[in-house]
């Protein structure tokens, strides 16, 4: 029997029994291929241990987030669910295995899919899992990805239905989420202890000698929908 089935009322008509509430999920979806690429572009290469995301810290943040939502509705039965979606390239299983096992050891479920061609990404799998949890009962959705092409429309549709939706990522790559009126954006570096050391992101106090472009936080088109 699943957690959801256990939470449902098994005999609502029995005298003296308290009706148990159906569990609703606070779902975190981590788009590993997309965020690995984004982090690599910030670092200019593969991350060292100091700059790899700490999923135990992310899990604690998700637990705190769930507790905040539960406090707003004491009668709600909320359950956090942390998921990571990733591709496994041919010949990389042994290299990736310790990372996958570490994720599972801190409470993350991992959806792993062989990377055999350009069409074998995990976008459709993430969206299918989100749809499944929405059908079963979704209290809040948090998606860690910069892929606006895949996620913006479905996430905004969910948000318009009344379910809080947050996008986690790096603001340099997430103008679509920052520009949205219905999505909350959370920069990963603002989550406590997710990174052991500050990321080498370009700012006014860390400019290279040759100068650098500072990308806008929102697209210029967002002015059309904002008040003067």
Which residues fall in each region the model found?
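Domain-level signal for Mg2+-assisted phosphodiester chemistry and nucleotide/NA-binding surfaces
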Residues: 2-120
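Nuclease catalytic cores that cleave nucleic-acid phosphodiester bonds
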Residues: 92-227
């Amino acid at each position: 029997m699943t957690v959801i089935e256990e939470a449902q009322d098994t005999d609502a008509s029995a005298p003296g029994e308290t009706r148990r509430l159906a569990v609703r999920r606070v779902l975190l979806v981590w788009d590993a291929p997309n965020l690995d690429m984004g982090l690599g572009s910030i670092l200019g290469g593969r991350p060292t241990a100091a700059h790899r995301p700490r999923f135990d810290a992310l899990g604690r943040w998700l637990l705190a987030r769930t507790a905040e939502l539960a406090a707003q509705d004491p009668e709600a039965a909320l359950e956090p669910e942390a998921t990571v979606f990733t591709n496994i390239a041919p010949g990389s299983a042994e290299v990736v295995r310790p990372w996958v096992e570490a994720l599972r050891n801190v409470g993350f479920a991992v959806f792993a899919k062989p990377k055999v061609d350009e069409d074998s990404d995990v976008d459709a799998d993430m969206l299918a899992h989100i749809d499944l949890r929405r059908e079963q009962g979704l209290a809040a959705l948090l998606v860690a990805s910069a892929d606006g092409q895949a996620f913006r429309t479905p996430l905004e549709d969910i948000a318009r239905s009344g379910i809080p939706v947050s996008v986690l990522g790096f603001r340099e790559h997430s103008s679509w989420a920052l520009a949205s009126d219905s999505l909350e954006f959370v920069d990963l570096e603002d989550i406590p202890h997710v990174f052991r050391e500050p990321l080498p992101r370009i700012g006014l106090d860390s400019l290279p000698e040759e100068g650098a472009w500072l990308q806008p936080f929102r697209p210029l088109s967002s002015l059309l929908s904002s008040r003067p």
